[in-house]
Swiss-Prot record:
Its cofactor is [4Fe-4S] cluster. Belongs to the IspG family. It comes from Alteromonas mediterranea (strain DSM 17117 / CIP 110805 / LMG 28347 / Deep ecotype). This is 4-hydroxy-3-methylbut-2-en-1-yl diphosphate synthase (flavodoxin). SUPFAM superfamilies: Enolase C-terminal domain-like, Nitrite and sulphite reductase 4Fe-4S domain-like. The lineage of its organism: Bacteria, Pseudomonadati, Pseudomonadota, Gammaproteobacteria, Alteromonadales.
């Protein structure tokens, strides 16, 4: 029920990764990357489908060998989400996956061989309308840049990126996006800020090798949040040493917290204290697990007492305020007569939330129809 995000996004050009528009005001896309062996087609397809099930809009797949390229061909046939092929060094792999219908090539033109090889890949991308992602990483900077700067710096990452950008510019190719990732938040943020001033192309955001599920989520939220709050970024990936499904969940949570994109339920819940009249933590955890399938954006407040409960409920689509034995229920910011028994909250609140989500979804369909 809060107003739209006050963030003014950086202007950028538009590319399309399959059917997903990137840049020029398009919704910020959330993507992930498989961590299976690409040659294990069944496992890779299964993981891609699980990523898509929680909202993944683009999936990157590593294609290190020709054998993996042949597996990619079969994977592409079995999924509908746009796929990005991650390729290093061998330009022939890029040509092969282009033949097999790849939606985007993640390559660095400067490391796939001489200019003729680069030209062959770019000409193929032009012919098949395939965008390219230039991906610079603080852990793999060119040796001369390491010597020049002594260590990875924002300037070093951007100089590396601009080398690849210049190659594409010389070949009259502008359908690309760029990332300048690092595992250090300040290094990555500084590099993206510099790059945003130098080019108009879309920027793919990420804090690379961020860490395990908890620490990586925090680091990504801080780094990506800083950039997104400044209007920088057109697509995001949260890199976690965890199930890629978790990357999508965290990515959408970051966008949701900045009111950039809303997907699913935004739970507003107190950390609980001795004033709580029901088990707030247990209730919220249970509902989060049960309601992961709901995609309709909505705010649900679950507060254990009457100190902050009514205030939060008044700005929520549904709100629960703790009271002795029977807790108060709010809908659209207004108190309703019905009260819910504290000893049976989860089942009843789940039913209320699902019903509200269905009504909101129907209202959204009607509004879109009227606009059309």
């Amino acid at each position: 029920m809060f107003a739209e995000s006050p963030i003014k996004r950086r202007k950028s050009t538009r590319i399309n990764v399959g059917n997903v528009p990137i840049g020029d005001g398009a919704p910020i896309a959330v993507q992930s990357m498989t961590n299976t062996r690409t040659t294990d087609v069944a496992a890779t397809v299964d993981q891609i489908n699980r990523i898509v099930a929680v909202g993944g809009e683009i999936v990157r797949v590593s294609v290190p060998t020709m054998e993996a390229a042949e597996a990619f061909k079969e994977i592409k046939k079995q999924v509908s989400v746009p796929l990005v092929a991650d390729i290093h060094f061998d330009y022939r792999i890029a040509l092969k996956v282009a033949e097999y219908g790849v939606d985007c090539l993640r390559i660095n033109p400067g490391n796939i061989g001489n200019m003729e090889r680069v030209r062959s890949v770019v000409d193929c991308a032009k012919d098949k309308n395939i965008p390219i992602r230039i991906g610079v990483n603080g852990g793999s900077l060119e040796k001369d840049l390491q010597e020049k700067y002594g260590e990875p710096t924002p300037e070093a990452l951007v100089e590396s990126a601009m080398r690849h950008v210049d190659i594409l510019d010389k070949l009259n190719f502008d359908q690309f996006k760029v990332s300048v990732k690092a595992s250090d938040v300040f290094l990555a943020v500084g590099a993206y800020r510099l790059l945003a001033q130098k080019i108009d192309q879309p920027l793919h955001l990420g804090i690379t090798e961020a860490g395990g599920q908890r620490a990586g989520a925090v680091k990504s939220a801080v780094g990506l949040g800083m950039l997104l709050a400044e209007g920088i970024g057109d697509t995001v990936r949260v890199s976690l040493a965890a199930d890629p499904v978790e990357e999508i969940k965290v990515g959408f949570d970051i966008l949701k917290s900045l009111r950039i994109r809303s997907r699913g339920i935004n739970f507003i819940a107190c950390p609980s204290c001795s004033r709580q009249e029901f088990d707030v933590i247990g209730t919220v955890n249970a509902l989060e697990q049960r309601l992961e399938d709901i995609l309709t954006p909505m705010d649900v407040s679950i507060i254990g007492c009457v100190v902050n409960g009514p205030g939060e409920a008044e700005v929520s689509d549904l709100g629960l305020t703790g009271a002795r034995n029977m807790s108060g229920l709010y809908e659209d910011g207004k108190r309703v007569k019905e009260r819910l028994p504290n000893d049976d909250l989860v089942d009843k609140l789940e039913a209320k939330i699902r019903a509200k989500a269905a009504r909101l979804s129907e209202q959204n369909k009607i509004q879109v129809s009227v606009k059309d």
